[in-house]
Amino acid sequence: MFSSSFSYPSKTSPLTSPFLAEHSSASGRRLEHRSLCDHEPRHQYRPPWEWNPYPTNGPIASPTCFDFPQDHQGLPSPSGVIFNPSDRFLYAPSGPHFQRGFPAEPRALLGRYSAFGSDSQLFFHDGRNRVLPPGFDQFFDYAAEGMKERITPGIRPGQVDPAEWLRSPDGESSEERAGTDSVEAPEEKEDAHSSGGCGEKPCTRRKKRCPYSKQQIIELEREFLFNIYINKDRRMQLSHLLRLTDRCVNNPLNQDSFFT
């Protein structure tokens, strides 16, 4: 089925196709180009709980990720300043590769990432929390103030005491006024029954009113001294004589009839 004139080239044959020659030269140039590039090693970050505090007295600069012709090699750009701490501490990984990013130090001029070192690129203040950034410290402050107010409640400078609203013009609170009113209530009721009510002035207990005069009482006592019971005609005569009604002519010994 195969013709004898067709033969496959041997593996040891020096003849190669032009396509294979071009492909091999391109791959060789690519390998040569790769060998000229220096790949930066990937950073291995340590967990925050293994970091150590470092004192800082100058501005901390962020790394410059791009090199521009007008910038010097290794110097951070002026816009890269993050904050300016004074006498504070920063947390950063411990190790010989850590370098503080101060423009005045010569170690900060070693390379692009010299401001943050080869181990880390993030610094945090020595605040209340070692895991969260320093911006979350204000929430811890607010929480601490709330706990203090719960333990020792007080009145803020701009706040008005609610008890002052309930005070009367005399300076007594509503509770004190309610206590005094409850004590004085029975006495006022007794005075009201006895005197029939009085104005805004303080009431004094008065004696019961007597509807008879002294002369009328003497005449009635004289009449009832000899006769305990009198008839209707004699009652009418005494009423006209003493200028009383028939119902008012009673025995003076019965005090309830004289005092109403």
UniProtKB/Swiss-Prot annotation:
By its UniProt entry, which CDD domains does this protein fall under? homeodomain
Q: Which GO terms describe its molecular function?
A: DNA-binding transcription factor activity, RNA polymerase II-specific; RNA polymerase II cis-regulatory region sequence-specific DNA binding
GO CC terms on record? nucleus
Xref: InterPro entries: HD, Homeodomain-like_sf
Q: Which UniProt keywords apply?
A: Developmental protein, DNA-binding, Homeobox, Nucleus, Transcription, Transcription regulation
Q: Where is the composition biased (Low complexity)?
A: 1-14
Q: Name one Pfam family in it.
A: Homeodomain
Compositionally biased intervals (Basic and acidic residues)? 167-179
- Where do the record's region annotations for Disordered lie? 1-21, 151-206
Cellular compartments annotated: Nucleus
Gene3D superfamilies per UniProt:
Homeodomain-like (1.10.10.60)
The record places the DNA-binding region at 205-260
What family classification does the UniProt entry report for this protein?
Belongs to the Abd-B homeobox family.
**What is the recorded function of this protein according to its Swiss-Prot or TrEMBL entry?**
Sequence-specific transcription factor which is part of a developmental regulatory system that provides cells with specific positional identities on the anterior-posterior axis.
Protein name (Swiss-Prot/TrEMBL): Homeobox protein Hox-D11b
Organism annotation: Takifugu rubripes
Q: What is the lineage of its organism?
A: Eukaryota, Metazoa, Chordata, Craniata, Vertebrata
